[in-house]
Amino acid sequence: MTTIHDHLGRQLVIQPGPQRIISLCPAITETLLELGSKSVVGRTKYCIFPQEIVEDIAVVGGTKTIDEAAIHALNPTLIIAEKEENTKEIVETLAAHYPVFVCQVETVDDAYRLIETLGTLASVQQAAVALIDKIQKTFAQLPALSGNAAYIMWRKPYMAVGKTTYITSLLEMLGFTNPITKLDGRYPAVTIEDLQQAKLDYVLLSSEPFPFSEKHRAEFEPYLANAKIIFVDGEMFWYGARMLKAAHYFNTIQQAFN
């Protein structure tokens, strides 16, 4: 048996060799499968990528509620969770029966660490190293952007991405400044007045979890005359394997910021 520590410093003991992994986070499931892992035996109903592979993997509930019977039936040797995506109660419940590795991703560097960690846990280290290298090189080729940008993810109330979040770290890596980090909380509720005071150059309206679309432009544009309203694909702000697609995505939408 091997003793390891997860991203929260929790100690767990796992068996050596191939694992039977249940992933409770969509970005983690996608990354494991994109790395070529054959170890994933269970996923949440929200783990929908890569589509051609996940449909053959058993569903064990959602990210906030789990089907314990389905999990026990799969006889996993390792469960991988994520601090923000899954609840403490889920982790504690499952940890009474199985090793549960909890990942934590709050920065771009954390995302690279996640890929490396998954490579180790699923015995696909070489693929993980290669993916990290490819992502870093692709991002390095992007022209630097600049300006104040707020990423709006919810409506009624409006909620924005704030401090100590992967999305803010990604925006900063691209060259933006996120003034919402001055507010309390990681995903603070914001008003139009808050956005006005932030002196924004860009308002990024995400496609998820709330599906902002063109019809919502009028809620912002008349009140933020100096800011450009840009609709962005929320899936491109996932961490893990999706970062490679994200780098290409940001390259294709460069003109929207000019």
Question: Which residues make up each language-model segment?
Answer:
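N-terminal ligand-binding lobe of clamshell/alpha-beta domains
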Residues: 1-258
